[in-house]
Amino acid sequence: MKFFALFIYRPVATILLSVAITLCGILGFRMLPVAPLPQVDFPVIMVSASLPGASPETMASSVATPLERSLGRIAGVSEMTSSSSLGSTRIILQFDFDRDINGAARDVQAAINAAQSLLPSGMPSRPTYRKANPSDAPIMILTLTSDTYSQGELYDFASTQLAPTISQIDGVGDVDVGGSSLPAVRVGLNPQALFNQGVSLDDVRTAISNANVRKPQGALEDDTHRWQIQTNDELKTAAEYQPLIIHYNNGGAVRLGDVATVTDSVQDVRNAGMTNAKPAILLMIRKLPEANIIQTVDSIRARLPELQSTIPAAIDLQIAQDRSPTIRASLEEVEQTLVISVALVILVVFLFLRSGRATIIPAVAVPVSLIGTFAAMYLCGFSLNNLSLMALTIATGFVVDDAIVVLENIARHLEAGMKPLQAALQGTREVGFTVLSMSLSLVAVFLPLLLMGGLPGRLLREFAVTLSVAIGISLLVSLTLTPMMCGWMLKASKPREQKRLRGFGRMLVALQQGYGKSLKWVLNHTRLVGAVLLGTIALNIWLYISIPKTFFPEQDTGVLMGGIQADQSISFQAMRGKLQDFMKIIRDEPAVDNVTGFTGGSRVNSGMMFITLKPRGERSETAQQIIDRLRKKLAKEPGANLFLMAVQDIRVGGRQANASYQYTLLSDDLAALREWEPKIRKKLATLPELADVNSDQEDNGAEMNLIYDRDTMARLGIDVQAANSLLNNAFGQRQISTIYQPMNQYKVVMEVDPRYTQDISALEKMFVINNEGKAIPLSYFAKWQPANAPLSVNHQGLSAASTISFNLPTGKSLSDASAAIDRAMTQLGVPSTVRGSFAGTAQVFQETMNSQVILIIAAIATVYIVLGILYESYVHPLTILSTLPSAGVGALLALELFNAPFSLIALIGIMLLIGIVKKNAIMMVDFALEAQRHGNLTPQEAIFQACLLRFRPIMMTTLAALFGALPLVLSGGDGSELRQPLGITIVGGLVMSQLLTLYTTPVVYLFFDRLRLRFSRKPKQAVTE
């Protein structure tokens, strides 16, 4: 009593307290960062190593395995995968959430150092690492194009000047430059000319290496001067290399230009990048795991003018893709939804109270509670994201509930003739415990979410804390500011209502009277109501089991990512043509704004494409609908597949897959894995629950297997090293020398001119100089035959692995797909030597599925404990919790009606309903207990009176919560696919619970009262409890 009086009779102090809360919230709002979702990125580090010319199997056994054994000892590694292809190995380390990325990076470097002695001596450089997830979509893509400069020169500008500068920007984790390679002098040898001159490829290599030398020459010095010695020992351009004498034949000089074509070109000609059908260099920028995407993008944009000033005017630097506009648009949509929710909630209050003066009170309480929450969000290190803003939107209905309960009770006393200040004090005292019970029990719902681990726990923590803080501030405001404003603003008379609102008042009275009559009938037919309640419980269980489930709603971020997978024996020239063909098909799509792509490198048969769609306001279809239409057109392209998927804000794992979800096969028996993977993949491809089924196992690449005749080699004076050196010199794009320039280092690359390697007959033109100086053709001591060979070798942990990726067809959920995969694996009878498990997002979904029911039960148990403590009763909490089954049925039926799968967002809605719908029962039970204690009423009379007296606030609070969530259901635009499942769940649950709990709660109350009387020794205890 004194607590309430302290604020009611000191209006200045109460107003200033509310102003302080509001100002703190405004300050916090201005400092809060912006993000699409809470920070849920796993710390990921990528280790890269190269050994030019080495086969995938050689890279896996000699490079990947030693590194994996060393890296696997690092603490906190939750997953380690590797992929070895021609000349390169990449190892992805995913760490636990609580692992500091910088500390992990130090451990990675130490592990690399420890494994260095076990690595091949021919590696051109030590393994390196990057603090970025290669499977993440870039947050920004920059392109360089020019009509003047070559691709190699553009790549040089990008890698030498732009990439290092961008990498230094806060939040940037990795800048991957693609589309070409560094400039180089390429020596294309003519094998016939070499044979005619008696010059071996090793002779050419040695001559070039010896002619381009950078060594210190020392200095000359006398008594007064010092001269640094400088020579022309370096060759820098193709023109300088052409006249180089490499051999003397019969006294005549054989120059390099006589036996080779020397050009200024690039290190690796098997790379191509394009933007909108124009050759381009791509800078793909990825953020650090802990970085904020909006702040990082803004920082990059702020540096762009400076970057443009460092490159020639003839080079065009453009932003091809930027993830931030759709994120900003999505958050603007949520903010608009929040404003609409506030307006609708205040409108509900006005319609019920029919007084502008009374409506002002909750109209003040709601903004104070919501704005004050921003200060707590800032102190907790949160961000303004879709989930935290959705929490505030839903909180609109909650925070007004407290004010409504207090205001409505005070207004009831005023209408009875009580003076305003007395009515404020008396009304607040009567419902203070009710408001406290409603708020604490609602916050209790979120305690299991706060204790939940893993990615779901991190994802939902900001939502739960934000909503809990808003409810806490609302509780304070409703017990301080609201009664003070009621006492000083409201008058002791019935509200003067406008004529147009009298109809609503009469309708409300008629509705209350009708409810009273129906309630009397229900209280005389309690068994029927009990059967209905039991039926809702059973229906809940059936609906939950049968409803399709997924991890997170599929987002339309306006960005698509595509992986190209072609025949494993395809040439680079043909692959570049496929890239161009796919880009043309996509550019013809009206909804596409920009498309970039690249191919080449160590895996010639693969490529990547990044597609930016037009803003949602400029297209009528969702990203998934566009993918479905493009899928049919792309399927007509022979010899290659382009698998498209919408970029999501949540992606788990470090695998670079061509689809959204993965299923990984593991085995310690590589032969068994290679036998069963194609069978499993083909089986999964036939399932209607899956689309775009593909695999990273590529073991059917074309290989030419050379078989040496060692006896013949010994007789001819040739050793294996000389023969292998010949092949590397001829076909391996061998880097034989280094050209040093002020800004970078470039290579001299030697190979047989591609004009002479168009078919297998090129091997017949190769020869080795033996120990007697004679040219011995390769065909004299070797035979060759075509064979199959892997293009890549993949590991997970220390086991051989193969990952099958898939997307979901329209209308299918992740639960449908996972169940279908489990059935297929059982039908195939896969041996125990091959183990299958879901990976990435699909794995998190499986883990979440296992904990959902436990989470809901824990929330209900927590609410029961809190209510039991507040009411000092084992029974009354059960009465209050009896409202939940009807809400669950309504929520699940609504999801089914809208064809929305049960996702993590829908789970939030279920958890919220646990807190919302019990408010009705709390108001009924509180007033019924009060009537029994002080009104000497029977339990049936007490609960009947409580239901009628609290009918108006129950309707007000329910409609306020419903209208607060309704904009989420009706919202469109960016991010609506995240908001709608939450709104659908809440609105469906509220409608169903409102229809049933007005009748089931009094019946359950009387049932437990009779039960308590039956087992009680003192019947009066039922009244006094």
Swiss-Prot record:
For this record, the Gene Ontology CC terms, alphabetical, are: plasma membrane
Where are the bilayer-spanning segments?
3-23, 333-353, 360-380, 387-407, 431-451, 463-483, 528-548, 853-873, 875-895, 897-917, 953-973, 984-1004
Keywords, alphabetical: Cell inner membrane, Cell membrane, Membrane, Transmembrane, Transmembrane helix, Transport
Query: Could you tell me one molecular function GO term of this UniProt entry?
Result: xenobiotic transmembrane transporter activity
Major location, coarse class? Answer: membrane
Tell me which stretches of the chain form a coiled coil.
none
Paired cysteines (S-S): none
Pfam families the UniProt entry points to? ACR_tran
Domain of life according to the entry: Bacteria
* Induction statement: The mdtABC operon is transcriptionally activated by BaeR.
Keyword presence, Membrane: yes
Record membrane topology = Multi-pass membrane protein
Where's it found, cell-wise? Answer: Cell inner membrane
| InterPro entries attached to this UniProt entry | AcrB_DN_DC_subdom (IPR027463), Acrflvin-R (IPR001036), Multidrug-R_MdtC (IPR023931)
Q: How does it assemble?
A: Part of a tripartite efflux system composed of MdtA, MdtB and MdtC. MdtC forms a heteromultimer with MdtB.
Concerning its family, UniProt says:
Belongs to the resistance-nodulation-cell division (RND) (TC 2.A.6) family. MdtC subfamily.
**Entry-linked PANTHER family:** MULTIDRUG RESISTANCE PROTEIN MDTC, PTHR32063
Task: Describe the task this protein carries out.
Answer: The MdtABC tripartite complex confers resistance against novobiocin and deoxycholate.
Protein's name in the database: Multidrug resistance protein MdtC
Species whose genome carries this gene: Escherichia coli O81 (strain ED1a)
The UniProt gene name for this protein comes to mdtC
